[in-house]
Regions:
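Class I S-adenosylmethionine
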Residues: 3, 17-138, 212-217
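Cytosolic-side transmembrane helix boundary signature
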Residues: 1-15
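Class I S-adenosylmethionine-dependent transferase superfamily signal
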Residues: 113, 188-190, 221
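S-adenosyl-L-methionine
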Residues: 132-160, 165-168, 172-174
Length: 228
């Protein structure tokens, strides 16, 4: 689902969009390490990595027995997963000229944006260099998109650039990096958005009840962007 949050305390209107990934109920996400059709299996400093070839797509899975971290379609089109929902972000923004992806992975968001918004300038940040290497080898990551190997929050702290869309896809499986879920982090994101810009956050867990992680994260974002 989407929650639109617009700031009331700043001159420009900034929208924040949160959506919950439903991929953990998809038949594609019952992922076990003993499955066949593995194109690659290995480890990086951060992750256990598997690349799996399916008939219509190639997927990357990390660390756990389920979940899809990244996907590329063998025939261009929508994925049928939460990545498609995120494509609404540029349509919600006042402009759709630039995008920053924090948690580039193997470039799923970037490929989708390139396909449906071909004139958009895209910048990627990915902390795991091995995933970036796999992106070029197995996932047809667009060669014209610059990808920096760095922590997303640290990258924001060092950058002065602003964007129409910022996609936060650094929440891996069921874990959330604390440094990218705080009031300070979302304040930095807001400061890097152009007027009328949109932030998208992927929360990879289905839980929206009282006291849930979703509720806590939504409250944190609302404290920065406002409730209106």
């Amino acid at each position: 689902y989407f929650i639109s949050i617009k700031a009331k305390r700043i001159a420009c209107v900034v929208s924040a969009v949160i959506f919950v990934a439903t991929s953990c109920v998809s038949p594609l996400t019952g992922f076990a390490f003993w499955e066949t059709n593995l194109a690659y299996e290995g480890e990086s400093i951060y992750n256990y990595l598997q690349v799996k070839n399916l008939s219509d797509r190639t997927i990357l899975s990390t660390n756990v027995l389920f979940g899809v971290q990244s996907v590329t379609m063998k025939d261009k089109g929508l994925t049928g997963m939460y990545y498609d929902t995120a494509l609404a972000a540029p349509a919600l923004a006042d402009n759709a000229n630039s995008a920053l992806i924090l948690g580039m992975g193997t470039g799923t968001y970037a490929r989708q944006l390139k396909q449906y918004y071909p004139k958009m300038n895209i910048t990627g940040v990915e902390i795991d260099q091995k995933i970036t290497d796999l992106a070029g080898e197995y996932f047809d990551e667009p060669a014209d998109i610059p990808v920096t190997t760095y922590d997303g929050r640290a990258w924001l702290a060092a950058s002065h650039d602003k964007y129409d869309v910022i996609m936060v896809d650094a929440y891996q499986d069921i874990t959330i990096p604390f440094q990218m879920s705080s009031t300070e982090f979302f304040t930095m994101v807001r400061e890097h958005l152009n007027p009328g810009g949109v932030m998208v956050v992927n929360m990879n867990m289905i839980s929206d009840g009282q006291g849930s992680i979703n509720e806590a994260l939504s409250d944190t974002i609302a404290s920065v962007f406002g409730n209106g």
